[in-house]
């Protein structure tokens, strides 16, 4: 019989984030695997604490980026509680499996022989934990959900937004895992480090081109949020090749730029549409700082115009005027640029007049 599969349905800030599916290594650590499996199904009823022996409704209470995410304290919710199906604590079963890669399930503890219900999922290799914590499973699907949890904002390692195991359970042998295949054609892991396929430069170019095309489809439909995600994802894959040297084909850097620059510019337009003005400023600045030999005049014009538009929305009229003037220099005939430049100047003049009147009243 194959190893058990279990799942968590995760919410972040009360919004569904997705499902994580685990394999439990019953063949190597049967007692530890059974504890986790039963806590996913809740089949053991109430524990000695008077709380249900179940992960359902419990939090990920401790998250450390580039290390691990920790949960399983369903009694106290802060890392001080939890309970196993065998009583409060049980012994370390064995240390056969090592913390040699991300997405492993391992038992949290307070020292030897103190396993309860708390667990963690590694997000990087953590060999310093070998011989101290029992590895008992791995993530099969839902790596992007783990990364979303890992990247949550925290204060003293606790997520600012509640990250909750809203539902959990066991999947029968042969049962569908409940994770829908991507409908938009995006079959790639959210982060390149988690992508198990080839990642040579030409592979990355192909992936990024596909993601950009998917982003463009969303953009044309007016779905700017999903379009933005695809453009950012494409950029993440392109960043797998952060630098170029004399050993690279001469045309390679240009091929990367030909995809990356449009992704940045499209992301900046999405940011404008979504009201993410600081993000728009950041992304367009990245474009303007790009190696100039790969920037077309229209790229520069778009970047200045969109950055100016973002600054207008944050009432930085002087900054907007500066950017619109630079866009106007690149394309003197563009009526839209002329209009926004005049608008920015009028807004700045009105602001100064208002400030002048306020000062006059103060000293009247």
UniProtKB/Swiss-Prot annotation:
Subcellular location: Cytoplasm
GO molecular function, one term: ribosome binding
Per-repeat ranges for TPR: 208-241, 261-294, 301-334
Domain PPIase cyclophilin-type intervals: 7-170
Principal location: cytoplasm
PROSITE patterns: CSA_PPIASE_1 (PS00170), CSA_PPIASE_2 (PS50072), TPR (PS50005), TPR_REGION (PS50293)
GO CC field: cytoplasm; intracellular membrane-bounded organelle
One GO-annotated biological process of the protein: protein refolding
Keyword terms, alphabetized: Cytoplasm, Isomerase, Repeat, Rotamase, TPR repeat
Reactions catalysed, as given in the entry: [protein]-peptidylproline (omega=180) = [protein]-peptidylproline (omega=0)
Domain of life: Eukaryota
InterPro entries noted in UniProt: Cyclophilin-like_dom_sf, Cyclophilin-type_PPIase_CS, Cyclophilin-type_PPIase_dom, TPR-like_helical_dom_sf, TPR_2, TPR_rpt
EC number of this enzyme: 5.2.1.8
Leader peptide range in chain numbering: none
Annotated function: PPIases accelerate the folding of proteins. It catalyzes the cis-trans isomerization of proline imidic peptide bonds in oligopeptides.
Family, similarity comment: Belongs to the cyclophilin-type PPIase family. PPIase D subfamily.
PANTHER family, sorted: PEPTIDYL-PROLYL CIS-TRANS ISOMERASE, PEPTIDYL-PROLYL CIS-TRANS ISOMERASE D-RELATED
Record's protein name: Peptidyl-prolyl cis-trans isomerase D
Native source organism of the sequence: Rhizopus delemar (strain RA 99-880 / ATCC MYA-4621 / FGSC 9543 / NRRL 43880)
Lineage summary: Eukaryota, Fungi, Fungi incertae sedis, Mucoromycota, Mucoromycotina
């Amino acid at each position: 019989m194959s190893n058990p599969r279990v799942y968590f349905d995760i919410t972040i800030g009360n919004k569904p984030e997705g499902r994580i599916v685990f394999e439990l290594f019953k063949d190597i650590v049967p007692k530890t695997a059974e504890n986790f499996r039963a806590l996913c199904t809740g089949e053991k009823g109430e524990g000695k604490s008077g709380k249900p022996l179940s992960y359902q409704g419990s939090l990920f209470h401790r998250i450390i980026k580039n290390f691990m995410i920790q949960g399983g304290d369903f009694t106290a919710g802060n890392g001080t509680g939890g309970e196993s199906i065998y009583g409060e604590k049980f012994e370390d079963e064995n240390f056969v499996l090592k913390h040699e890669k991300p997405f492993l399930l391992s038992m949290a503890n307070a020292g030897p022989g103190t396993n309860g219900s708390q667990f963690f999922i590694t997000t990087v290799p953590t060999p310093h934990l070998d011989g101290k914590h029992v590895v008992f499973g791995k993530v099969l699907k839902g790596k992007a959900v783990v990364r979303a949890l890992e990247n949550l904002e925290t204060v003293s390692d606790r997520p600012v937004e509640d990250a909750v195991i809203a539902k959990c359970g066991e999947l029968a042998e042969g049962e569908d895992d409940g994770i829908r295949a991507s409908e938009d054609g995006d079959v790639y892991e959210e982060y390149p480090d988690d992508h198990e396929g080839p990642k040579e430069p030409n592979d990355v170019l192909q992936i990024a081109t596909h993601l950009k095309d998917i982003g463009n489809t969303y953009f044309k439909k007016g779905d700017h949020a999903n379009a933005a995600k695809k453009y950012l994802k494409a950029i993440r894959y392109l960043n797998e090749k952060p630098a170029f040297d004399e050993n690279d084909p001469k045309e390679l850097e240009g091929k990367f730029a030909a995809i990356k620059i449009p992704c940045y510019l499209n992301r900046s337009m999405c940011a404008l549409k979504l009201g993410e003005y600081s993000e728009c400023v950041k992304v367009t600045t990245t474009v303007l700082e790009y190696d100039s030999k790969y920037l077309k005049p229209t790229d520069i014009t778009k970047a200045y115009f969109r950055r100016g538009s973002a600054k207008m929305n944050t009432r930085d009229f002087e900054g907007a005027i500066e950017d619109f003037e630079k866009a106007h220099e690149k394309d003197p005939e563009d009526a839209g640029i002329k209009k926004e430049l005049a608008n920015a100047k009028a807004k700045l003049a009105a602001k100064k007049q208002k400030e002048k009147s306020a000062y006059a009243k103060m000293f009247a």
